[in-house]
Curated annotation (Swiss-Prot):
<feature type="binding site">
    <location>
        <position position="241"/>
    </location>
    <ligand>
        <name>NADP(+)</name>
    </ligand>
</feature>
<keyword id="KW-0560">Oxidoreductase</keyword>
<dbReference type="InterPro" id="IPR002347">
    <property type="entry name" value="SDR_fam"/>
</dbReference>
<feature type="binding site">
    <location>
        <position position="137"/>
    </location>
    <ligand>
        <name>NADP(+)</name>
    </ligand>
</feature>
<feature type="active site" description="Lowers pKa of active site Tyr">
    <location>
        <position position="241"/>
    </location>
</feature>
<protein>
    <recommendedName>
        <fullName>Short chain dehydrogenase resG</fullName>
        <ecNumber>1.1.1.-</ecNumber>
    </recommendedName>
</protein>
<dbReference type="GO" id="GO:0016491">
    <property type="term" value="F:oxidoreductase activity"/>
</dbReference>
<feature type="binding site">
    <location>
        <position position="237"/>
    </location>
    <ligand>
        <name>NADP(+)</name>
    </ligand>
</feature>
<comment type="pathway">
    <text>Antifungal biosynthesis.</text>
</comment>
<dbReference type="InterPro" id="IPR036291">
    <property type="entry name" value="NAD(P)-bd_dom_sf"/>
</dbReference>
<feature type="binding site">
    <location>
        <position position="87"/>
    </location>
    <ligand>
        <name>NADP(+)</name>
    </ligand>
</feature>
<feature type="binding site">
    <location>
        <position position="110"/>
    </location>
    <ligand>
        <name>NADP(+)</name>
    </ligand>
</feature>
<dbReference type="Pfam" id="PF00106">
    <property type="entry name" value="adh_short"/>
</dbReference>
<comment type="function">
    <text>Short chain dehydrogenase; part of the gene cluster that mediates the biosynthesis of the tetrahydropyranyl antifungal agent restricticin that acts as an inhibitor of CYP51 and blocks the ergosterol biosynthesis. The highly reducing polyketide synthase resH, the short chain dehydrogenase resG, the cyclase resF, the FAD-dependent monooxygenase resA and the enoylreductase resD are required to generate the first stable intermediate desmethylrestrictinol.</text>
</comment>
<feature type="active site" description="Proton donor">
    <location>
        <position position="237"/>
    </location>
</feature>
<comment type="similarity">
    <text>Belongs to the short-chain dehydrogenases/reductases (SDR) family.</text>
</comment>
<keyword id="KW-0521">NADP</keyword>
Length: 359
């Protein structure tokens, strides 16, 4: 019945949370898009001078716009982690032409491949890159029944697994002393990691979450390896974004406990008029009537990347304001899922040769 509907309308009307009329629900979300989302102003005299900034998924849409806006803040080096390197080279030329003294580096990063993630971080390490800001924006949506070479649904691997794995591999490059900032300017304190989730995380739950004392018959990650348990593309996307938000929350908690000065921010730009969803006349009409501009979405990313204050650490920003994750995520089952997920990701990381996280 709903197969003819374009995205994101299909995602909205097929959501189990359709009749949730709290701010978490899909209908209040749709109504908010045109009336909220104006980002708070950036800090006066904000400068990223002498800083190294990484943006993934920066060849189009909100990611590209965020890269452009961050470039205007004058970082020493802007790294674009992208799947399409040839397109990124054109963007590099444009950014360097429009922004004096900016150096842009293009590095290939395909989140459908864990090996590509390894190579990407190895390249950064080999070049002695120290990151001040990592904006992990890359995402993916398609009605796609493929399984990647790593054995996972592409929707899950790109939107959660590879992004979380990249996060863990980048931590040693972020946990370093930040450079001094120019006199008369303000620089965000300490290194920062921004994880881009989606309000769709609130439109799903996770099946069969056991209590901590119970044995789990199927690991969380394996749910996304079996076509019989994947669910629809809409649900895969929502669950991947739910897991990413929970991962970010647990990471921020553990970094604080370990006295690591890296700030973690979880954010969403909302629905923006980009090419994220498959193109079509109805999709374009929905974008025209309901979507935010990519400039708004990019500005929300920049705010998440630069907003000052200790309260920003571990925050989930919606419409540029700290708010709670979904009721499920904050409830007892969500907390169990968060704890289980961290354990699985820590084991996954070490199985791929990562050092014990010590957090």
């Amino acid at each position: 019945m709903t197969g003819f509907l374009p995205e994101p309308l299909r995602m909205l009307v097929t959501s189990p949370a359709l009749l949730d009329f709290t701010s978490d629900g899909p209908l209040p979300y749709a109504l908010r898009q045109k009336f909220t989302g104006k980002p708070p102003p950036v800090t006066s005299n904000l400068s990223l001078a002498s800083q190294t900034v990484l943006v993934t998924g920066a060849t189009s849409g909100v990611g590209l716009e965020a890269a452009r806006q961050l470039a205007q803040l004058g970082p020493r080096l802007l790294i674009l982690g992208v799947r399409n390197a040839s397109k990124a080279e054109q963007i590099k030329s444009e950014l360097e032409r429009d922004t004096p003294n900016l150096t842009v580096q293009v590095a290939e990063l395909d989140l459908e491949s864990l090996l590509s993630v390894d190579r990407f971080v190895d390249e950064l390490s080999a070049n002695s890159i120290r990151l001040d800001l990592a904006l992990l924006n890359a995402g993916f949506f398609a009605h796609d029944d493929r399984i990647t070479d790593d054995g996972y649904s592409p929707l899950f691997q790109v939107n959660f697994l590879s992004t979380a794995y990249l996060t863990l591999k980048l931590l040693p490059l972020l946990h370093t002393t930040a450079p001094p900032h120019p006199p008369g300017t303000t620089t965000p304190p300490g290194p920062r990691l921004v994880l881009v989730t989606s309000e769709a995380h609130a439109w799903t739950t996770f099946p069969d979450v056991p209590r901590p004392t119970e044995n789990r018959t199927q690991p969380i990650l394996s749910v996304f390896q079996d076509k019989n348990t994947l669910g629809s593309a809409d649900d895969q996307y929502a669950r991947a974004k739910l897991l990413l938000a929970l991962f970010g929350k647990e990471l921020s908690r553990r970094l604080t406990a370990a006295e690591n000065d890296t700030t973690v921010v979880i954010t969403t730009p909302g629905f923006c008029a980009s090419n994220f969803f498959p193109d079509g006349m109805m999709t374009r009409l929905i974008q025209l009537t309901s979507a935010r501009s990519v400039q708004q979405g990019g500005a929300l990313h920049v705010f998440a990347a630069t907003a000052p204050g200790p309260e920003i650490h571990g925050a989930y920003l919606r419409d540029g304001k700290p708010t709670g994750l979904s009721k499920f995520a904050q409830g007892p089952q969500g907390q169990i899922l968060q704890e289980r997920l961290w354990g699985e990701m820590e084991e996954f990381f070490m199985q791929r040769g990562g050092s014990p996280l010590g957090m």
